């Protein structure tokens, strides 16, 4: 099993390091130019729609879709996951503080990509069995006609179901189990049972219940984490200026790396920073369009603007706060990584409550991701097999959640990363093929 895991990891590394990093960033740069820096010109519109969504408290989701804020909340639920805690720590250890600069760069261009995804998801959404639905599988068929388009759409759907619906949710459950076992000594199986039961209850309520939960959960979890990070940064304010010096200097001058992180090259800072940004905000991977497709908006451009805000919240706010807490802690050279490093950084200021705080955040982040990824998988499962088998899909996901809470999931992580990469390829090809459609819609925006 260890040998097979290594093979999958090597294949995943080749896919991500030699194809997807360039394809994802290149697509972002392409849309940034083609759409005339839409991430800047539409940012204010996105903020306006965000606050409008807060004030309206959108209507309950139904067969005709969900409110634009519910769609954004569902997308952010998937975007803001355990990677914002553990993945950020790993990127800083592997790529140094300069990696955060390259995370910002990839996220900036990713905003243009996710705008295109949301616009196309809105444009090519359809109604199946009386329920509004949409996502990459539908605009892939529009981009490539005939058997080739059908093959790419099916390939995307299968890869997404495996990467997110099954294995991805298994990993999220495992993260919750580990966090609660380490913080409270709770048996991982017990944690798995509780998470599986809660998830099953929400799954059975369909898109209406998922949207209702994410609409409330996402603002609460984001605010809770932001306040915790802000308290630490205020207490450690004197170290913040030097943290920014390290971020900008070490992105270009590896020989100037301070704090003992020796041997990290500019290439490593770029690689780990860009990869972390792409993994975190999911721009270009083809996941979040499933939520944006269901938004009830006047025009596709409105949801595109909101999608930009999703990347901003995920990367420029939550992930950046995590990085600043870690850099100012001075613990990066100590040899720790992942959750252990983040828990240690928070424990410096919060004491024993640091582990508890991270465990609670892991619960929020991972469980919200489970809901988002389940929904994305359901859309594609229904596209392949029909909505009458939705409960079968729900049962399989619940079983994976239950099993994942207590197992060692190295192979599952490797497979999830690999299939995540595979699903991005047809999505990016479709985005580029339909770039003219996106540009035309963007030009015809009405105030």
Language-model segments: residues:
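N-terminal alpha-helical transmembrane segments of multi-pass membrane transport
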Residues: 1-78, 82, 93-98, 110, ...
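Transmembrane helix-loop junctions in multi-pass membrane proteins
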Residues: 3-4, 34-39, 83-88, 165-176, ...
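Membrane-interface loop-to-helix entry segments
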Residues: 23-30, 35-47, 156, 173-180, ...
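Helix-loop-helix module between adjacent transmembrane segments
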Residues: 31-32, 106-130, 141-174, 178-203, ...
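Transmembrane-helix boundary/entry motifs in multi-pass membrane transporters
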Residues: 50-72, 107, 118, 122-163, ...
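Alpha-helical membrane segments and immediately flanking helix-loop junctions
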Residues: 56-94, 120-123, 128-143, 155-161, ...
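Selective recognition of specific alpha-helical transmembrane segments in multi-pass small-molecule
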Residues: 109-117, 193-207, 218-238, 271, ...
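Extracellular/periplasmic helix-exit of transmembrane alpha-helices
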Residues: 115-129, 230-246, 254-261, 294-297, ...
């Amino acid at each position: 099993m260890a040998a097979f895991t290594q093979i999958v990891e090597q294949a995943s590394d080749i896919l991500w390091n030699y194809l997807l990093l360039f394809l994802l960033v290149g697509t972002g740069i392409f849309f940034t130019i083609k759409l005339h820096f839409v991430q800047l010109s539409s940012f204010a519109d996105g903020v306006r729609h965000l606050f409008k969504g807060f004030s309206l408290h959108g209507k309950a989701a139904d067969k005709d879709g969900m409110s634009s804020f519910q769609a954004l909340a569902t997308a952010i639920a998937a975007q803001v996951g355990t990677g914002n805690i553990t993945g950020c720590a790993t990127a800083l250890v592997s790529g140094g503080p300069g990696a955060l600069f390259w995370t910002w760069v990839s996220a900036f261009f990713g905003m243009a990509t996710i705008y295109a995804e949301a616009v196309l998801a809105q444009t090519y959404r359809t109604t199946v069995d009386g329920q509004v639905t949409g996502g990459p599988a539908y605009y892939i068929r529009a981009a490539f006609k005939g058997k080739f388009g059908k093959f790419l759409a099916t390939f995307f759907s299968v890869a997404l179901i495996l990467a997110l619906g099954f294995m991805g949710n298994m990993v999220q459950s495992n993260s919750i189990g580990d966090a609660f076992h380490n913080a409270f000594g709770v048996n991982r199986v017990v944690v798995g049972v509780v998470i599986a039961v809660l998830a099953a209850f929400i799954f059975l309520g369909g898109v209406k219940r998922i949207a209702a939960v994410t609409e409330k959960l996402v603002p609460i979890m984001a605010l809770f984490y932001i306040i915790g990070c802000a308290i630490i940064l205020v207490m450690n304010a004197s170290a913040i200026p030097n943290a920014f010096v390290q971020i900008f200097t070490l992105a270009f001058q590896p020989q100037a790396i301070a704090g003992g992180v020796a041997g990290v090259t500019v290439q490593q800072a770029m690689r780990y920073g860009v990869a972390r940004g792409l993994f975190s905000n999911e721009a270009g991977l083809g996941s979040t369009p499933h939520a944006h497709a269901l938004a009830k908006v006047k025009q596709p451009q409105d949801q595109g603007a909101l999608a930009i805000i999703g990347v901003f919240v995920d990367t420029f706010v939550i992930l950046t706060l995590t990085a600043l807490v870690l850099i100012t802690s001075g613990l990066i050279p100590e040899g720790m990584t992942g959750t252990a490093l983040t828990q240690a950084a928070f424990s410096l200021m919060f004491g024993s409550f640091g582990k508890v705080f991270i465990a609670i955040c892991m619960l929020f982040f991972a469980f919200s991701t489970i809901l988002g990824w389940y929904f994305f998988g359901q859309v594609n499962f229904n596209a392949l097999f029909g909505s009458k088998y939705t409960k079968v899909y729900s049962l399989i996901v619940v079983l994976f959640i239950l099993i994942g809470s207590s197992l060692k999931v190295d192979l599952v992580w490797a497979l999830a990363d690999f299939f995540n990469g595979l699903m991005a390829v047809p999505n990016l090809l479709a985005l580029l093929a339909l770039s003219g459609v996106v540009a035309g819609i963007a030009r015809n925006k009405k105030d």
